[in-house]
Amino acid sequence: MKISFIEPAILLYAFAMTLTIPLTAQYVYRRIWEETGNYTFTSSSNVSECEQNKSSSTFAFQEEVQKKASLFSLQVEISGLIPGLVSTFMLLSSSDNHGRKLPMVLSSLGSLGTNLWLCAMSYFDLPLQLLVASTFIGALFGNYTTFWGACFAYIVDQEKEYKHRIIRIAVLDFMLGVVTGLTGLSSGYFIRELGFAWSYFIIAVVVLVNLAYILFFLSDPIKESSSQIVTMSCSESLKDLFYRTYMLFKNGSCKRRSLLCLLIFTLVVYFFVVFGITPVFTLYELGPPLCWNEVYIGYGSALGSLSFLSSFLGIWLFSYCLKDIHIAYVGIFTTMVGMMLTAFTRTTLMMFLVRISFFFTIMPLSILRSMLSKVVHSTEQGVLFACIAFLETLGGVTSTSAYNGIYSATVAWYPGFVFLLSAGLLVLPAVSLCMVKCIGWEEGSYTLLIHDEPSEHTSDS
């Protein structure tokens, strides 16, 4: 008997992803350190190997390592851009007809293969450039945006009422906060006690368990239409996929199209900033003046992950006195303040305190996704989340590439510049939300917008 709870799959995947990101960043940093300096990276119980005297040759060496690590991360992200975009768009768009489980299964297979390859690389000390190839191959199966997009569409399929939907998403954010917080807290101890190879192996086992749950225990609310598969060729299916995407923006009134485009723009730009700055945080904390080791980075990651928990509480409390659009404003402006404060942080205590200003960072992402789901028909949820995941994949790779490039170019004269730049970029989603408000967004207006749509959502040819 199959069940319809997507939450276990999301939490297991979140554990794997949350542990993989800091592990990979530190693994790349250490490998480049050892290859550049020809000696083994060591870490004390308090701080990492870090020289704070700018006149020292070691300080210049550290800056060189940070530049190389940032540029290598840029290469890795770019390698997965094109296959990730194509696979994400096609898998999620086709999930309206073929079910939500297929994107989850394939993206989990890609994650499993990538972590097994990282395990082999760290165990056998294989060339670091092979990470670029594994990222490219893994992206062919989809990536994290593919998995999250399918999960959000799965929840929307089950929860027809908007209030129930947003509560379930908020509860999910709460659970994600607990899992990612504990994972981030333990990531440093994983590295110190188990090393990179065994840590990646544990992640691979978790992904394998998650894959088994999705395949054998999770039900699919979208039933596969066998007649459509028989009568439609591959080219016709691809044509139908693009046609439904085109109709998503063509159907409905001018107000609906304007709201849809503005909300997608707001979500993508905000995601661009928040996701792009994440790997820079690790590099910023590893270098002077903070000079954190893997345990402190784990503490920082855990504190940052509390934004899922605090965002859940924020949505729950603010929903009693604020409208959706105002809740999104709170998250954007508090994140903007946090970026500006981080740029001027020079001590460990201040860095921990600055993390508090990021406690509502996830709120706009949850709210904007819920707002978007209100302006499209239930049969278009897969296409909508395919577009969102496609743009998030493009924005995610572009942002991490851009931020890594900017950080490597500015780390020598001012490491905090990227955070000031992020604060400035957050003005764009704030202005976009103002335009949404001016057009006339109302909490219950989505019903009228959906009724504006034609009943046909698929191609007749």
Swiss-Prot record:
Motif Tyrosine-based lysosomal-sorting motif: chain residues: 446-449
Catalytic activities: estrone 3-sulfate(out) + n H(+)(out) = estrone 3-sulfate(in) + n H(+)(in); 25-hydroxyvitamin D3 sulfate(out) + n H(+)(out) = 25-hydroxyvitamin D3 sulfate(in) + n H(+)(in); cholate(out) + n H(+)(out) = cholate(in) + n H(+)(in); glycocholate(out) + n H(+)(out) = glycocholate(in) + n H(+)(in)
Positions bearing carbohydrate: 38, 46, 53
Regions that span the bilayer: 71-91, 104-124, 136-156, 171-191, 198-218, 261-281, 302-322, 325-345, 348-368, 382-402, 416-436
Principal location listed in the UniProt entry: membrane
Keywords: Glycoprotein, Lysosome, Membrane, Signal, Symport, Transmembrane, Transmembrane helix, Transport
Subcellular location per the Swiss-Prot or TrEMBL entry: Lysosome membrane
Pfam families membership: MFS_1
Any one GO CC term of the record: lysosomal membrane
GO molecular function: copper ion transmembrane transporter activity; symporter activity; transmembrane transporter activity
GO biological process: cellular response to 2,3,7,8-tetrachlorodibenzodioxine; vacuolar transmembrane transport
Domain of life of the organism encoding this protein: Eukaryota
Family: Belongs to the major facilitator superfamily. SLC46A family.
Role, per record: Lysosomal proton-coupled steroid conjugate and bile acid transporter. Preferentially recognizes lipophilic steroid conjugates or bile acis as endogenous substrates and seems to mediate escape from lysosomes to the cytoplasm. Modulates hepatic cytosolic copper homeostasis, maybe acting as a lysosomal copper transporter and sequestering copper ions in the lysosome. Delivers pathogen-associated molecular patterns to cytosolic pattern recognition receptors as part of the innate immune response to microbes.
Record protein name field: Lysosomal proton-coupled steroid conjugate and bile acid symporter SLC46A3
Species of the source: Rattus norvegicus
Gene symbol of the encoding locus: Slc46a3
